[in-house]
Amino acid sequence: MYSIEQFPPEADLETVPVLKKLNSAHRYLAELKGICRSIPNQGILINTLSLQEAKDSSEIENIITTHDELFRAGISASPSSPAIKEVQNYASALHCGFGLIQKHGMLTNNHILTIQAELEKNHAGFRKQSGTMLRNDRTGETVYTPPQHTDDIIRLMSRLEAFINDDNTEKPIDPLIRMVLLHHQFESIHPFYDGNGRTGRIINVLYLVLTGLLDIPVLYLSRYLVRNKSEYYRLLQHVRDTGEWEGWLLYMLEAVEQTAKDGIDTVQHIHQAMLDYKHRIRQNFSFYSQDLINHLFNHPYTKIDFLMKTLNVSRPSAAKYLDELTEGGFLHKEKIGRSNYYINIALMNILLPTD
């Protein structure tokens, strides 16, 4: 029987189907980690792919934006819609969390509070009032009541913090299984008034970095979860109702595998596009530099001011470079408001979903 107090669960987690799926998920995750190292500046992947994850993770919570709106807003000084701001907050919280684990080598409750504060733009902290219940969106029926008292929330989160940061030697559990378990436990504690789902999904990828399964946070599960949203919530609740973990484990490991495959494909395409741009720009333009290539792939959109700062060149020079690259078919020039923006055609084609 399921109990939130019994964590990690004592159930038999490593069934034959789970072990089979676990091996496959690890294989593709390791391949993703390796191929990310083919990009000279891995910050490019964090910047571009985190925007996709931010969009998809927010969509699970019914915060809907388009990729194009998001990319434009990322380089525009004009006010964004509330939905765009929510998505930008997610990307900012993800970057914040990655910085914290890089600096401290661990993920504490204080770090989780900081991530959630960056996400929600408030400092409400852990829930202090009772009354939080999880309901079926369609029927309004209460399907789960998380811990109601602050003392219980703090105690359970302290235990979860210890689980995240222990050395996993006393009763070793595979790190991917640990990630799946801690995600369920965090969602079940539901420690915040708002932002639990998105904070939990940030914790997932940070945990993979913390355990060395990835170097940078580029496994973004949310696109898979958006496509299979009803099953995600059904299996979360199925564990609580029955204490059976296998279905939840298989679902999340499949999410890891499929997302890793998508990530491998995306990174390979970005790598090839960078090599193509590098070769053709170096061949045809005297102003070629690796810094220029990195800049063009750091974000799908750029503008004169940004290139001036990156390359430390004058406004006329930056404008000349971008206009010549537009004439050469590398960029697409678009006027938005009073500013000209330059869109990396190859990168945009890679990042915009085709389905």
Enumerate the language-model features and the residues they cover.
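FIC/Doc superfamily catalytic core
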Residues: 1-355
